[in-house]
Amino acid sequence: MKKTDVIIIGAGPVGLFAVHQLGIKGLKAVVIDNLDKAGGQCIELYPDKPIYDIPAVPECTGEELTKRLLEQIKPFKTELYLNERVEEVHPEKDNWIVKTNNKEEFIAPNIIIAGGVSSFEPRKISLKECEKLEGKSVFYAVRNK
C-alpha cells in the first residue's frame, strides 16, 4: 500500500493544479486517472480547442494548458497512476484507503476528487471486428495531429 499526504482522483486541469498548490505547501500527492494520459477532457477530447477562461492567460489550447500544468508540477515529482480506475474508497481510522482496478492501493489522510464532469470512457463500437482494429485504424480520441 502506497502512503502519501493526499490522493487526487482525476488528472485533469483541476487535479494537476491541486498538485501544484499542495506541493507549495510541502504536501506530497499521488494522482489517479482512468485515462491513459494527464489532461482530462482538455487533452482527450479538445486538444486544439481554444480556452479563454484561465486567469492571466488570454488564450491557450487544451494541449498547451496540459503541457504547462505538467511542467509546473515537475519539481514535486508527483506519481501519476494513469489507466487506473478507482474502484473503492473507504475510511480507515484517520485515513482513506483507495483501491484501483489494477490492484493498486493507496492510503492518505486527505482525498481530492477532481473528476470534473466525472470519469468518462469512449462509447466503443459494439462489433467484435472493431476490437482488433482499436489503436491501429479505429480510434476514440485525438491521438496525433
Where are these regions (language model features)?
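FAD-binding core/adjacent interface of flavoenzyme oxidoreductases
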Residues: 1-9, 25, 80-145
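Glycine-rich FAD pyrophosphate-binding loop
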Residues: 7-9, 23-45
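Glycine-rich Rossmann-fold phosphate-binding loop(s) that bind the pyrophosphate
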Residues: 10-14
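Flexible, glycine-rich phosphate/dinucleotide-binding loops
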Residues: 15, 38, 60, 89, ...
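Residues at secondary-structure transition points
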Residues: 37, 49, 60-64, 128, ...
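N-terminal Rossmann-like dinucleotide/flavin-binding domain of flavoprotein oxidoreductases
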Residues: 43-105
